[in-house]
Regions:
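Extracytoplasmic and endomembrane cell-envelope/extracellular-matrix remodeling and assembly machinery
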Residues: 1-26, 30-31, 70, 75-102, ...
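Alpha-helical scaffolds flanking conserved acidic
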Residues: 34-41, 58, 106-111
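A structure-centric signal for secondary-structure junctions around beta-strands
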Residues: 37, 57-58, 149, 218
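Short, surface-exposed glycine/acidic/tryptophan-bearing loops
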Residues: 51-72
Length: 242
């Protein structure tokens, strides 16, 4: 983070985190994992819900398809739950908790989140050390993973000591607030935008998991907070929406 590019990336991510910080903190608490794990979302995606890596890892927490399905992140032609900040955060928290239960150490759990549990298992078996720093010294983990855990620790220290790192003046984006309403029929997002007098871009931002400009029947659509009653009433007046 000492380079201009690295610092700009960190600051933009911390600013964007304001939209999701309270949500992530709540889910991590509910799943019983340390709050510091929020910094994995910064390292993985910079808190971008629609981030996609060169290896097709997707979403804020960068799940590949198989791992996502393992933790209940469903995909269809209409939506991809890996792009849903709340669902993906819960899946990531549960995955990290499982990794901790497997390795008995949060540093190893974080390393396994990056390179997969098999990579950490092989490193432990090869050296006889179930300790990240011993594995680090022996250079038996992938280079990316050897750097990954220190990056998470560095971000944790920097955020907790924001003044010491000239980060105290970052103005975070306001949190995204919303209600949810189940759609009884295929519903165009532009219609919801018209009903709520909000831009379509906001409706899409509230629903990053949607791959199209419509929500399928049965989908729990996120709508601007406080709009549930009049959105429901307006949809009831539209033929075919019941």
């Amino acid at each position: 983070f000492s380079t201009d590019k690295g610092r700009k990336t960190l600051i933009s991510g911390l600013r964007r985190a304001g939209k999701y910080r309270s949500l992530i903190a709540r889910v991590l608490d509910e799943e019983g994992v340390p709050q510091e794990l929020i910094h994995l979302a910064q390292a993985e995606s910079g808190f971008l819900p629609r981030a996609v890596s060169r290896k097709a890892a997707t979403g804020m927490w960068q799940f590949v398809q198989a791992r996502g399905r393992e933790y209940g992140l469903m995909q269809s032609s209409y939506h991809d739950d890996r792009l849903d900040p709340e669902k993906a955060t819960r899946a990531a928290a549960r995955h990290l908790r499982d990794l901790y239960n497997e390795f008995g150490d949060w540093y190893l759990a974080i390393a396994a989140y990056n390179c997969g549990p098999g990579g950490v298992e092989r490193a432990v078996q090869r050296t006889g050390y179930a300790d990240f720093w011993e594995l680090y010294k022996r250079n038996v983990l992938p280079k990316e993973t050897r750097n990954y855990v220190p990056i998470i620790l560095a971000m944790t220290i920097m955020v907790k000591n924001a003044r010491d790192y000239d980060l105290e003046d970052i103005d975070p984006d306001p949190p995204l607030e919303y209600d949810s309403l189940e759609m009884s029929a295929v519903t165009n997002l532009a219609l919801i935008a018209d009903i709520t007098d909000q831009p379509v871009s906001l409706i899409r931002e509230l629903n990053p998991a949607l791959l199209k400009t419509v929500a399928p029947a049965g989908y729990e659509l996120r709508i601007p907070k406080g709009s549930t009653s009049f959105v429901a009433a307006a949809l009831d007046l539209i033929p075919g929406s019941k």
